[in-house]
Design a protein with these regions (language model features):
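Short, charged, low-hydrophobicity "junction" segments
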Residues: 21-24, 102-104
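Residue-level recognition of oxygen-bearing side chains
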Residues: 13-16, 99
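A conserved beta-strand element that flanks and buttresses the S-adenosyl-L-methionine
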Residues: 3
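Conserved Class I S-adenosyl-L-methionine
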Residues: 63-158
Length: 158
């Protein structure tokens, strides 16, 4: 078994990476992968809209190397007839809009923070928080639901 939980999206060239990982499996072995599916993420949609407008200088930073499900299908089907691809969405609850930003500060926001001055970082966070506050609903109990879309696939070596 080779598995990756929210990891391979940091590695480029999945067209080469996945067959390479697959080649290390024994017969009957399985590759199992879960990645954040940013294309369906409200948070990343807001972040990318911010980059399209005010923060264009950050737009060239490539966070993830995620492919489409169809692209993964083509890769996996070239390796084995025994594979599956599916999506899921986890619902996490947070206490505040700051908690949403905090969730991503250790991962998805870090490449942006790394190139900003302290003053720019503060302004960037304020801009992002404004968008978040306009697009995430506060529930009756005061909590906020943070939807986390995920893409999964498994492939077994015949």
């Amino acid at each position: 078994l080779i598995f990756s939980n929210a990891c391979i999206h940091w590695i480029p060239d999945h067209q080469t990476l996945i067959p390479s990982l697959f080649s290390h499996l024994s017969e009957g072995g399985r590759l199992a992968v879960q990645i954040p599916y940013k294309r369906k993420s409200v948070f990343y949609g807001l972040l990318f809209s911010l980059l399209d407008k005010k923060w264009k200088k950050l737009k060239e930073i490539r966070l993830f190397n995620e492919l489409t499900p169809e692209e993964y299908y083509d890769i996996l089907s070239s390796l084995s007839a025994d594979f599956s691809i599916w999506e899921s969405e986890y619902y996490h609850t947070v206490n505040s809009f700051d908690d949403i930003i905090g969730w991503y500060e250790g991962s998805g926001l870090r490449p942006y923070y790394d190139v900003l001055s302290p003053a720019e970082k503060e302004e960037f966070i304020a801009d992002l928080k404004k968008l978040i506050s306009e697009n995430f609903k506060i529930q009756q109990n005061g909590k906020i639901i943070l939807k986390m879309p995920r893409l999964f696939f498994t492939v077994t070596k015949d």
